[in-house]
Amino acid sequence: PYLTCNLQPIDDCELTLPVSEETCDERYFTKPQRIAQTAIDHTFRTMPPDAEWEVRMTSPSQNMSTFLRSHQPWLQVYTGEKLARRGLAVEPMTCPPDAFNSGISLIHLAPGEQHQMHFLIGSE
């Protein structure tokens, strides 16, 4: 899903990510900071592990925030360059990219077993 603050360009918004270690980039948004021209298309390990976390994008000029909450251990974030940066893609994930080869965080299901994941999107 894409988070947006009334389709305002995300460059003017502040972002907070629940990351403990970043797998692809050296920039962290562990405290609210302006996205500006930062391009993100990366996977992050979430923090705290196995607990609910929140990605929050805030528009100071509109005094509003949108957020996504989940408890998955991984998170994909994309700054939407192909969409004129009008939204921030946030995808909770059960494992990092290439997990079938690395085996990291794979969930093994026996025939007939199920695995469910949930997330919540909201605005304030």
Placement of each model-derived feature along the sequence:
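Sterically constrained small-residue positions within well-ordered secondary structures
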Residues: P48, L68, E81, H108-A110
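Glycine-rich active-site loops that engage anionic ligands at enzyme catalytic sites
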Residues: R56-P97
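Beta-strand secondary-structure signal
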Residues: E54-R56, A89, Q116-L120
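Active-site/ligand-binding surface loops and adjacent short beta/alpha elements
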Residues: P1-S70
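Short Pro-Gly-centered flexible turn/kink motifs
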Residues: H108-E124
